[in-house]
């Protein structure tokens, strides 16, 4: 589970990551990464709009993404990072495994993890 100290909650932090950060897209997700000068743990936030689906689908998608992101925290820089994972409509029908592949692909494209084979 993503601990409270690693959750991105404030609008200003989302804005920094979305407007000023690097962006990498996949079929189901867009990842935004920004580094701030503040000494706080890397934090992760999620944007899952109504375009993804109804309330149940949106919350299920966000829970899946939160679980995937929690497992990837150790690969990210420890301090000062803001990662926003924005779900596209196709994320609503994706499995947890498919979302994990997309998160990994996005992190590779952002240069946050080592490049692997099959990155398209």
UniProtKB/Swiss-Prot annotation:
GO function terms (MF aspect): 3'-tRNA processing endoribonuclease activity; ribonuclease P activity; tRNA binding
Alphabetized, the UniProt keywords read:
Endonuclease, Hydrolase, Nuclease, RNA-binding, tRNA processing
Q: Which residues cross the membrane?
A: none
GO cellular component terms attached to this protein's record: ribonuclease P complex
Q: Which reaction does it catalyse?
A: Endonucleolytic cleavage of RNA, removing 5'-extranucleotides from tRNA precursor
Q: State the Gene3D superfamilies in the record.
A: 3.30.230.10
Q: What is the superkingdom listed in this entry's lineage?
A: Bacteria
| Oligomeric and partner information | Consists of a catalytic RNA component (M1 or rnpB) and a protein subunit.
Name used for this protein in its record: Ribonuclease P protein component
């Amino acid at each position: 589970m993503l601990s409270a100290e690693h959750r991105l909650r404030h609008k200003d932090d989302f804005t920094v990551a979305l407007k000023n950060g690097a962006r990498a897209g996949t079929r189901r997700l867009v990842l935004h990464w920004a580094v701030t000068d503040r000494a706080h743990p890397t934090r992760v936030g999620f944007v899952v709009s109504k375009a993804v689906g109804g309330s149940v689908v949106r919350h299920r998608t966000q829970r899946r993404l939160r679980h995937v992101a929690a497992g990837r925290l150790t690969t990210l820089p420890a301090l000062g990072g803001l990662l926003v994972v924005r779900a596209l409509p196709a994320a609503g029908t994706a499995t947890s495994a498919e979302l994990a592949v997309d998160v990994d692909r996005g992190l590779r494209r952002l240069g946050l993890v080592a490049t692997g084979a099959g990155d398209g």
